Curated annotation (Swiss-Prot):
Family: Belongs to the wax synthase family.
Name of the gene encoding the protein in the UniProt record: aurG
Null allele phenotype: Accumulates autovertin E but does not produce its acetylated form aurovertin A.
Spans traversing the lipid bilayer: 3-23, 28-48, 59-79, 157-177, 219-239, 300-320, 364-384
UniProt-listed Enzyme Commission number(s): 2.3.1.-
Primary subcellular site in the record, as a coarse category: membrane
Location relative to the cell: Membrane
Protein name (record): Acetyltransferase aurG
Pfam families to which the protein is assigned, alphabetical: MBOAT_2
Organism: Calcarisporium arbuscula (Dendryphion arbuscula)
Organism ancestry: Eukaryota, Fungi, Dikarya, Ascomycota, Pezizomycotina
Amino acid sequence: MGLWLVLANQVGLVGTLVLVVCFTPANSLVRPLLLPGITALVSYGLILNKEAIANAGAWSLVNLNTAGLFLQYLDVGLISRWTYSAYGPTSSRGGQPNASLDLAGRKKPPSSSLLSRLQWGFSTATSWRAPSTVWEAKGTPHFEELPSRGRFLARNAMTLLWSVLVLDVMGLVGGDLDPVANAAHFTWDRVRFLARLGDVSRDEVILRATVVYMRWGAMYFSLQVVYSFLAIVFVMVGLSPVQRWPPLFGSFTEIYTLRNTWGKAWHQLIRQKVSSPAHYTTYSLLGLRKGGIAGRYTCILATFFVSGLLHLFCAEYSYGIQWDQSGTLRFYSIQALGIAMEDAVQATSRRLFAYRSTYWTRAIGYVWVLLWFLWTSPAYFFPLLKYDTEKRPPVLLGPIETWLQSRHVQ
């Protein structure tokens, strides 16, 4: 019964959003009046997800979608104010690309039929990057060449299997979870690094690096599994075309700066959702000047702060981590500081040394990014690891693990 309620909650959120963007004018009072109801549905959904879904990883993903739909409503319903008649956003207050296009420069709705409206509304509610449209989120990767439907399905099936296999291997290499060891190794004191650098042992550095980089790898492949699975289902049954499912991640050759890492290499699924309220707060509420240093970095900080709130509800909330033990907001907020630091270094280098990008500067950049995440990521990961006591059985390598265990016993 609980899972059916979870599904009903998701349908209610998506359905409300679809009806709002399809059938209400941009400035309709219905839109803000529905916000308390959306907030109540999301709050109930976060509680319901935890009670109905046993696997912590699964309910984290469902929580991400639940809280993400709240941000989606804020953006397309209230800030950017999408409508079917405009076939897109009607306001640029959320920093939406091309929102200022007049109606003559926009793609026209194919028809005014109910089915056409609902299809567009469903796409608007669920395609958070708005790929292959003029409203596409900045940094969204593209196909090198648009594949045929069959090739797309085959490629995503291989990606899905490969990603699951890698996660299985990572699970086997990681071994059994030891709650006692986790509680000792991943305390909040261990998050602090530079302040106690003289007391940090080589073994702790190795453990820290192993955990940080493996957790980022696990997040990468976990997101790829979900994305490839949904892409296969939606394209196979005809709910969306191939062009609505471009690659999830960009090129990891771009991770020589933090700005590129977050804006090009990592997924952009929530970029518009978290940047819209940040853009609105910075430039509409605070009235800071666009293009100014204060406005630019306030908006970056606000964007990462909103992203931190989203990840807090989808991850830490799932594990029951107390607020005073939480590091998610700290991790995401400090990324703005890192970007400001590297911007300052690059600007100074350009003025003093005629800086230009070379193989050597990129090599230094890769090291910088790896060290930055080695320093900052434990604030995000260690509280989760401390409370993570769930052994996740391998999906593909389960029989192999069983055979290895039987040989070990013999």
